[in-house]
């Protein structure tokens, strides 16, 4: 790291190193702000010097706080959201701070307490929160063909089974209990196939969808539940995954705003999100995503039947 400490040294670091360190600094800036009495649990979105690509100190007094829930490594989670929050910060002309939460319960509490202004939510989490606090649903992700998302039950490529019924006596990894794609919908899919939780040899509650995919690949579980975007992320790793069953097409995870932000700010954020077109920015969070489209509360009412 001497290239960072010695400004007179003319030999620049390789581009890959220079780019990969930015999300780490994104994370460290957040940790520093927490230590200095800033809002707890957030990454500070830096402003950028285009010549050096290194973050400069940002005034957080005007910052928006964007929350998301995952049990992923904080640096990996930061890498996923960093491109979008950087673009939003530039479009809005104000910093956007990332607030990572461990699970959906923590995220819901942060929104209700006003500790988060914007958030990416699972559909059922959105419905639950909509009943408890004032929210505006802004946008939802779509793929190139206009579809949203799917809940997937996946197995390893070398697993011979072809149907959900063949999971009887086998193990399955599920995600967060409030997760639409890695818990609630997969349970429904199994019920519809005539398979109860009691028919399975074991059911692991692994928190994140990444954990579900990884534990199927390493053989800890025969099957795992996840969204189609997480499936695509892990599909070709190691021995590979394949889809045993998938749900109907479902609206993707919405981005929402607290109504207290005010109509003008909410409209600015919505327009900024709708204008995001860079595939690298979109796919960093959700592989296969083509764009954001306007979302309406009614898009998610169908999920009431899954509660």
Predicted regions and their residues:
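Solvent-exposed coil/turn segments that connect beta secondary-structure elements
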Residues: 71, 121-125, 143, 156-159, ...
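N-terminal hydrophobic or amphipathic helices and topogenic motifs
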Residues: 2-5, 9-17, 26-106, 112, ...
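Bilobed "Venus flytrap"/periplasmic-binding protein-like clamshell domains
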Residues: 66-89, 101, 124, 147-214, ...
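Periplasmic-binding protein-like
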Residues: 65, 69-70, 144-155, 236-279, ...
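A ligand-binding cleft/hinge motif common to bilobed small-molecule-binding domains
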Residues: 123-132, 189-192, 214-241
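Stable alpha-helical elements in mature extracytoplasmic
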Residues: 80-84, 103, 107, 122-125, ...
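Short helices/loops that flank or line small-molecule/ion binding pockets
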Residues: 105-119, 132-133, 165, 209-225
């Amino acid at each position: 790291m001497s290239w960072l400490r010695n400004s007179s040294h003319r030999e620049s670091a390789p581009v890959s190193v220079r780019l990969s360190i930015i999300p780490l600094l994104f994370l460290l800036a957040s940790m520093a702000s927490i230590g200095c009495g800033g809002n707890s649990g957030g990454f500070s979105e830096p402003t950028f010097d285009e010549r050096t690509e290194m973050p400069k100190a940002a005034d957080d007094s005007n910052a928006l706080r964007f929350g998301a829930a995952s049990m992923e490594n904080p640096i990996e989670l930061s890498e996923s959201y960093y491109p979008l929050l950087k673009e939003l910060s530039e479009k809005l002309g104000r910093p956007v701070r990332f607030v990572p939460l461990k699970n959906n319960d923590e995220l819901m509490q942060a929104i209700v307490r006003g500790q988060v202004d914007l958030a990416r939510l699972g559909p059922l989490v959105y419905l639950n929160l909509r009943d408890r606090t004032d929210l505006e649903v802004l946008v939802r992700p779509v793929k190139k063909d206009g579809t949203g998302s799917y809940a997937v039950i996946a197995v390893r490529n070398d697993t011979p089974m072809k149907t959900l019924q063949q999971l009887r006596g086998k193990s399955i990894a599920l995600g967060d209990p409030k997760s639409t794609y890695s818990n609630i919908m997969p349970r429904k899919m199994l019920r519809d196939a005539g398979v109860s939780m009691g028919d399975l040899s074991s059911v692991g509650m692994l928190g994140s969808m990444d954990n579900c995919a990884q534990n199927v690949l390493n053989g800890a579980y025969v099957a795992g539940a996840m969204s189609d975007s997480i499936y695509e992320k892990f599909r070709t790793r190691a021995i590979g995954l394949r889809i045993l069953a998938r749900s109907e097409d479902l609206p993707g995870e919405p981005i929402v705003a607290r109504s207290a932000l005010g109509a003008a700010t909410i409209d600015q954020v919505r327009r900024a999100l709708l204008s995001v077109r860079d595939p690298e920015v979109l796919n960093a969070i959700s592989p296969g995503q083509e764009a954001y489209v306007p979302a309406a509360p009614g898009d998610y009412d169908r999920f009431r039947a899954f509660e």
